[in-house]
Amino acid sequence: MEGEQIMEYVQETPIIPKRIIHYSIPKQMITKPAPHVEMTLVANTFRDMDLPQHPVIHDCWQNKEYSTQRYSGNVAQQRLSFEEHPNEECQNSVGLIKRVSTFFKKRPLSRKNSIKSIGDVKSEARNRGEGLLGEVDNLNEQNVRENLTSEHEKSPEGDSKRYGLFSFEETPPIQVLEQGNINSELSSFKNTSLAENKRSSDSFVSLKPGEDEHSPLEISTCGNLTEREDLQSGEERFDSAAQNIKVASMKEKKKIFKGNKTD
């Protein structure tokens, strides 16, 4: 049965060489062995095909040994596989999977996470099994919460970094503005920012929308004549008061000087 499945797989491949070498694959890494082993096997294939004992290939780099085995079938479609010998020096060697045909089966698709794609999805595929997925999601969420609560109770400190729920949501699409809208919004933003600067500091005058952006800021002056007159009268009063104080101090000094002379 296994040989028939392998032969079917060979017939389904688009390009079929005359001789196909098949590799037994370890469980931990689904890759074929080192390239030097492959080259040795290919070089010895035609010479050792008809030997009663299958040749053994030594892999000195990985400290493993492989033996070739020929499958029955047509000469044009014969394939070789080599399996690892139990090496006495390396007791912890990984066992090989005997049923190679399992790798040729298609794996069922599984949901990786709960993030929904933003692209166009057909309505038939979206509606198909919607109820089943909802039930599965509810059961999974309930099981996750129960496990998290139990682990949280076990944990002495209740580490939230280690035990936590994560939810993913779609972000709304970003609206892209046209060039005209961008320019208008930038100009309005500049005008509002300049007006706010005027409120915070009265020593500057904000630019009007029609004025040039690069014009220098001017120092604001009092606009009304009455305000200017009030300022000037206040300054004159201050100067006269200062002069009166100076005159009074000079008179007192003269009086003191005259009193000293009479004595």
Curated annotation (Swiss-Prot):
It comes from the Eukaryota. Residues 198-224 are annotated as: Disordered. This is Putative uncharacterized protein YLR030W. It comes from Saccharomyces cerevisiae (strain ATCC 204508 / S288c). The lineage of its organism: Eukaryota, Fungi, Dikarya, Ascomycota, Saccharomycotina.
